Amino acid sequence: MEIEKIQETIRMIADENLDVRTITMGISLLDCIDSDSDRACQKIYDKITTKAQDLVKVGRQIEAEFGLPIVNKRVTVTPIALIAAASGDADYVKYAKTLDRAAHAVGIDFIGGFSALTQKGYQSGDRVLINSLPQALAETELVCASVNVGSTRSGINMDAVKDMGTVIKRASELDLMANAKLVVFCNAVEDNPFMAGGFHGVSEPDVVINAGVSGPGVVKAALEKVKGQPMDVVAETIKQTAFKVTRMGQLVGTIAAQRLGVPFGIVDLSLAPTPAIGDSVAQILEEIGLEQVGTHGTTAALAMLNDAVKKGGIMACSHVGGLSGAFIPVSEDAGMIDAVNAHTLSLDKLEAMTAVCSVGLDMIAIPGDTPAETISAMIADEAAIGMINNKTTAVRVIPVAGKQVGETVEFGGLLGHAPIMGVNKASSAAMIHRGGQLPAPVHSFKN
């Protein structure tokens, strides 16, 4: 029995694209706050390069020792809007460049936390950070940014929603890849190891290790053995597979934390696809019985997948967190791309899917002439789904200058490529320009 399980794990890694997607070190920068921004940036650089100096080395040691691929080594930091506010600077590009320099120095893949938490209104640093985003993302390579515009407890900051549409539009004019590194959240979590939305929350320890696993190919392979079986058998199969995948993530995260001398935080149970064939969430849904993802029944299949992954993962690891569900990024999933090209999967269907899955409208390319207010309205819709359902939702859309529906844009690497998707032509501008605060729902009042 044990030998069979060992062989199964080897098969998962060798044939089914099982990997640890990331080990992410969260680092608090609260002790780096300084009214002099040059001094603050030096403190930030010194702390990151000290705390994370062995992260990549330890990751590679674990890979070699256990034969487990760890795709990314990353760092998240305290939202920079909180750190930089003391400086009084007119923009925070300097802080972004410091993060980028530190990330290059320690050899990590990404650094997240050029972020602002604006769900109930703007603090002094928030507006400055948001206005800095286009230039900061265009002039750095490894820095990821996020802005939380709403929460179930606070409602939705419609001024921030309006501003983010404009920011995304401006960023797309400076650099195609800028918006691939920017996520707009509702109900953002403090312990997310995934990019581009990861940041280190203020209630987290000084330094912590979080792990993110990935196993769409493993789940699909398991489901191939239960063709035609009832849905409860399908759910049980997914649950058992998620258990095994999560156990591996916990093992890697715990060992990494021990060797780095820092606490272990959580395993994020998310199924994160890649553009590789056989590493697709869409293909899991098709294995469940859909001819192509996007057709009727897609939302139900995704809801079951998401729930079964959570149930299996929670059994495997006592500390789970992050986003924990199924990611549906269009450009990073071969099956999603095929469905968009076949006109089976639309933006409206993707929005419905986000009501039952892990994040939201993710890595979606839209025409470059899409108005900023339309982008803001897409953010508002997603934030409303998150607010009402008490879950994390997000938007990572990429307006591509000069491209129209039906054309394709190439991002490269883990980000893949994406067909340009059509948006509704009717204007939402009058609603977006109202601004203000969209009140929290009645069920948010829990005390």
From Swiss-Prot:
**Entry-linked Gene3D superfamilies:** 3.20.70.20
Q: Which InterPro entries match?
A: UPF0210 (IPR007841)
Which CDD domains does the protein's record reference?
RNR_PFL_like_DUF711 (cd08025)
> Pfam families from the xrefs?
DUF711
Q: How does it assemble?
A: Homodimer.
Family (UniProt): Belongs to the UPF0210 family.
Protein name as annotated: UPF0210 protein LAF_0976
Q: Organism source for this protein? A: Limosilactobacillus fermentum (strain NBRC 3956 / LMG 18251) (Lactobacillus fermentum)
